[in-house]
């Protein structure tokens, strides 16, 4: 384990030299595996992984491992003796604080004959004991360093003994498993020969194996202590001799010696098997191969493959055991089992399984390339299901066979089966529940925020949804209303308001102003004073109209002074205690509420705005608040209220902020920008005529005046003004203008109703007095009367028919050129014609027709009434 170094000077402790760069990288794979097996680390994997494990061990423990000297096939090479400060590849650390320097352990006793030459803690039998460790008092080390070194040495020795103990226990378990698998009852030797109780310093008695032991391939998880390889144990006589000789000095525990001896023989087998494996390319076709070949195969086989093979072997051996037990005696069964174990199985029972060979490529990038293909390996779930079916059939057959074994044999078989099942279960990964699997496959909040487009809506519990991405998408859509917050609360909804007193309903302010509340209270007081007799009388004959309220006041309350109730915006849900929160939207900067004014000692009322706030003086000194640049503050950047003055007296508005020239700093504090303060500058009339234009002569000006006069005399040709004599005649037969009015000269043909409605100059007439007419006879009318009202005036006020609202009178084009006098005459003629038509019209025929219809209705109704009445009279009985 130790490399050859020059002998240290006497009196100094030899410390391990630091490893050069690439120290472990230059070793061969066999050397790396040998050194990893010595420190108890896994030896499987590629060369880069082995190097990384050794470097990690060196960093964690501070122990520098030297390159091992491997023995060849001839066995003539031997490892050099360990250095003075190193024992079995472990450097001597400095002594811990507070302890004397640790003396090197005494040399171990000579090993029994037959011990391998490569045994690290013993020495070759022909060379004698090694030279004594020369460690004097260290000169360069302080007392604290020596104490620390001693503590580290003690800890390392304890760790070695603990590993030896674990290795011995594992070896015993493997031996028991092999015996159970072979199915042979091994004759138990006497106690003095078969089992030797060896009490290790740190553990109980461990039975040392006796007889040839077939090694089994074991695949242990990473980080577990690797069992030491076993070899042929020493003769029993030597063991007894060592046990019986108590006079020899301090010994290495015998269990540790056996383990290390087996490790050496195991190392030889591994070296020879690795050379053979390089030559082999085909898979092994028999199950009865040697233990060395089986172990070399299982180095690259995973745990699941190994367990599956074990189950297959177990299934094949079970029927053989049952048949042997039923046919032969126990002695014959032992012989048959020995023969069956020695002979090869038949060719029909051979199960060929293809195992891919892992290439040994010493390339640093090969590890990453290998991991990619490991992700695409086929799963063994289908094979497991197929294997479970024959297992069930075998169990059914075995239960049907009559049991002829004794109680001891059954008990032993059940123990073996249970131990096999336990061994099968241990290397498999623990089965996870569905809940744990869901938690493992669940997104984290950070991952979900990276996957979605709107990470601001992601909440803590969104990752537990069935489809988290869809949930976040729905929450991010526009106008989506969130689920109420109380869905995840422990307490029931609105149960936190139990201790809060609910105030009675209050009328809104605009209804209170009508005074209806006081009127109802007064009415209730009166009703309370009434007697029961009067109350019962009111129930029979209730009095209405007890509360008389002005309807105009009630109308104004709802249509003039009504205020909107407090509503929430879309998507704003109610939650417990929302009404008690302060609403910042109702608060405006600059407006002081009554509560704030009372707390500041300011007056409250209609003239409260004339008292300055207490922070005005500081604002005049330091400036307006930067968060509200457009806020108007009286006395700072806007004028103070009327009848107020600047000054520092009670109710004064401080000093206006001005610069050296007297100009306001922050705004119009004096109110000079108002319209009444601005002096109106009289604009001078500017001559817009082009310069140099010739002035018009007197003749041209007189011609223009004549043209204007002629334009005034001409009638309007645009069509907006209609002559008076043809514009006021209504085709319906009723005059729209009463007689006696002066006829206007010009009439607007198109009515401007929209402009008149906007101006509101004409107010509608409230009522119309109808003239009464008296007639001598009623006539044949059903509802006739001697008093008749003249409806002609009302019909004339209603105006023209709706289909003729546009133009009242159609004029021929040649009539538009007539002079105003001719139009007036034409208008009067039309008026006379209409009056004559009204007088000529007679409604007597219409009245007679209506009366005839009414008579017919009466005749039809009379016989029906008589029949109905007589029928009812007959049916009526007391």
From Swiss-Prot:
Modified residues (Phosphothreonine): 281, 294, 763
Modification note: Methylation at Arg-491 by PRMT9 is required for the interaction with SMN1.
Key words of the record: Acetylation, Coiled coil, Isopeptide bond, Methylation, mRNA processing, mRNA splicing, Nucleus, Phosphoprotein, Spliceosome, Ubl conjugation
Amino acid composition bias (Pro residues), ranges on this chain: 91-114, 122-133, 224-237
GO biological process: mRNA splicing, via spliceosome
Residue(s) carrying Omega-N-methylarginine: 205, 228, 230, 491, 498
Residue(s) carrying N6-acetyllysine: 258
Protein name stated in the entry: Splicing factor 3B subunit 2
Source taxon at top rank: Eukaryota
Function: Component of the 17S U2 SnRNP complex of the spliceosome, a large ribonucleoprotein complex that removes introns from transcribed pre-mRNAs. The 17S U2 SnRNP complex (1) directly participates in early spliceosome assembly and (2) mediates recognition of the intron branch site during pre-mRNA splicing by promoting the selection of the pre-mRNA branch-site adenosine, the nucleophile for the first step of splicing.
Cellular compartments annotated: Nucleus; Nucleus speckle
Matches recorded under InterPro entries: DUF382, PSP_pro-rich, SAP_dom, U2_snRNP_Complex_Component
Annotated region (Disordered), positions in chain: 1-25, 67-136, 183-356, 383-436, 674-740, 827-878
Subunit structure and binding partners: Component of the 17S U2 SnRNP complex, a ribonucleoprotein complex that contains small nuclear RNA (snRNA) U2 and a number of specific proteins. Part of the SF3B subcomplex of the 17S U2 SnRNP complex. SF3B associates with the splicing subcomplex SF3A and a 12S RNA unit to form the U2 small nuclear ribonucleoproteins complex (U2 snRNP). Within the SF3B complex, interacts directly with SF3B4. Found in a complex with PRMT9, SF3B2 and SF3B4. Interacts (Arg-491-methylated form) with SMN1 (via Tudor domain). Interacts with RBM7. Interacts with ERCC6. Component of the minor spliceosome.
Major place of residence: nucleus
Biased composition (Acidic residues): 695-715
S-S pairs: none
Biased composition (Basic and acidic residues): 1-10, 260-269, 330-342, 383-397, 405-414, 827-852
GO cellular component: catalytic step 2 spliceosome; nuclear speck; nucleus; spliceosomal complex; U12-type spliceosomal complex; U2-type precatalytic spliceosome; U2-type spliceosomal complex
């Amino acid at each position: 384990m130790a490399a050859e170094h020059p002998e240290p000077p006497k009196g100094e402790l030899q410390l391990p030299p630091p490893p050069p760069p690439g120290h472990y990288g230059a070793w061969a794979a066999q050397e790396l595996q040998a050194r990893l097996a010595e420190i108890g680390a896994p030896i499987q994997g590629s060369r880069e992984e082995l190097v990384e494990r050794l470097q990690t061990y060196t960093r964690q423990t501070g122990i520098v491992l030297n390159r091992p000297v491997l023995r060849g096939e001839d066995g003539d090479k031997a490892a050099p003796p360990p250095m003075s400060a190193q024992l079995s590849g472990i450097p001597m650390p400095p002594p811990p604080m507070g302890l004397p320097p640790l003396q090197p352990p005494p040399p171990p006793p000579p090993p029994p004959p037959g011990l391998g030459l490569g045994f690290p803690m013993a020495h070759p039998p022909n060379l004698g004991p090694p030279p004594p460790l020369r460690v004097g008092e260290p000169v360069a080390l302080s007392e604290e360093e020596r104490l620390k070194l001693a503590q580290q040495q003690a800890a390392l020795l304890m760790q070695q003994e603990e590993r030896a103990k674990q290795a011995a226990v594992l070896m015993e378990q493997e031996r028991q498993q092999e015996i159970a698998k072979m199915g042979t009852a091994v004759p138990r030797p006497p106690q003095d020969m078969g089992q030797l109780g060896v009490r290790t310093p740190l553990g109980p008695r461990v039975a040392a194996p006796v007889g040839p032991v077939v090694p089994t391939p074991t695949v242990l998880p990473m980080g577990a202590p690797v069992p030491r390889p076993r070899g042929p144990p020493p003769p029993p006589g030597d063991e007894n001799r060592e046990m019986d000789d108590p006079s020899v000095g301090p010994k290495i525990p015998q269990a540790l010696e056996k383990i290390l001896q087996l490790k050496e023989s195991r190392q030889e087998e591994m070296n020879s098997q690795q050379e053979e494996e390089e030559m082999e390319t085909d898979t092994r076709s028999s199950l009865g191969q040697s233990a060395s070949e089986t172990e070399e195969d299982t180095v690259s086989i995973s745990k699941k493959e190994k367990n599956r093979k074990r189950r297959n072997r177990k299934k094949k051996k079970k029927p053989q055991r049952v048949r042997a037990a039923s046919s032969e005696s126990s002695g014959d069964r032992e012989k048959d089992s020995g023969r069956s174990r020695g002979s090869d199985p038949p060719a029909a029972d051979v199960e060929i399984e293809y195992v891919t060979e892992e290439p040994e490529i010493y390339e640093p990038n090969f590890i990453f390339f290998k991991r990619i293909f490991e992700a695409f390996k086929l799963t063994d779930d289908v094979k497991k299901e197929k294997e479970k079916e024959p297992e069930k059939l075998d169990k059914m057959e075995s239960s049907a066979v009559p049991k002829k074994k004794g109680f001891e044999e059954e008990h032993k078989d059940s123990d073996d089966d249970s131990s096999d099942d336990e061994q099968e279960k241990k290397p498999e990964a623990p089965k996870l529940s569905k809940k744990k699997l869901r938690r493992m496959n669940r997104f984290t909040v950070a991952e979900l925020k990276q996957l979605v487009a709107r990470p601001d809506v992601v909440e803590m519990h969104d990752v537990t949804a069935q489809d988290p991405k869809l949930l976040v998408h729905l929450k991010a859509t526009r106008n989506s209303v969130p689920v109420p917050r109380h869905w995840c609360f422990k307490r029931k909804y609105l149960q936190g308001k139990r201790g809060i007193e609910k105030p009675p309903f209050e009328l809104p302010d605009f209804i209170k102003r009508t005074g209806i509340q006081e009127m109802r209270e007064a009415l209730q007081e009166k009703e309370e004073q009434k007697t029961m007799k009067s109350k019962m009388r009111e129930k029979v004959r209730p009095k209405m109209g007890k509360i008389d309220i002005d309807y105009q006041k009630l109308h104004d309350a709802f249509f003039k002074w009504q205020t909107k109730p407090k509503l929430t915006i879309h998507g704003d849900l109610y939650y417990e205690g929302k009404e008690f929160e302060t609403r910042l939207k109702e608060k405006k900067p600059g407006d002081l509420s009554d509560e704030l004014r009372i707390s500041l000692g300011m007056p409250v009322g209609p003239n409260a705005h004339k008292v300055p706030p207490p922070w005005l003086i500081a604002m005049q000194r330091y400036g307006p608040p930067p968060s509200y640049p457009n806020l108007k503050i009286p006395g700072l950047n806007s004028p103070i209220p009327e009848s107020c003055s600047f000054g520092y007296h009670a109710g004064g508005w401080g000093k206006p902020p001005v610069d050296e020239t007297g100009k306001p700093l922050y705004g119009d504090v004096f109110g000079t920008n108002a319209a009444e303060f601005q002096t109106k500058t009289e604009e001078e009339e500017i001559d817009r005529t082009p310069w140099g234009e010739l002035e018009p002569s007197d003749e041209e000006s007189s011609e223009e005046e004549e043209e204007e006069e002629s334009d005034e005399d001409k009638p309007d040709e645009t069509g907006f003004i209609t002559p008076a004599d043809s514009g006021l005649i209504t085709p319906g037969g009723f005059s729209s203008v009463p007689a006696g009015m002066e006829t206007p000269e010009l009439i607007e043909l198109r009515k401007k109703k929209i402009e008149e409605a906007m101006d509101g100059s004409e107010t509608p007439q409230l009522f119309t007095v109808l003239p009464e007419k008296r007639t001598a006879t009623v006539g044949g009318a059903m509802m006739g009367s001697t008093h008749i009202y003249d409806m002609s005036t009302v019909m004339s006020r209603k105006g023209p028919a709706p289909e003729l609202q546009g133009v009242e009178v159609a004029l021929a084009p040649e009539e538009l050129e007539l002079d105003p006098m001719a139009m007036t005459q034409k208008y009067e003629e039309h008026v006379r014609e209409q009056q004559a038509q009204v007088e000529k019209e007679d409604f007597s025929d219409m009245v007679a027709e209506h009366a005839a219809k009414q008579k017919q209705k009466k005749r039809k109704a009379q016989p029906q009434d008589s029949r109905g009445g007589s029928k009812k009279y007959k049916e009526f009985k007391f």
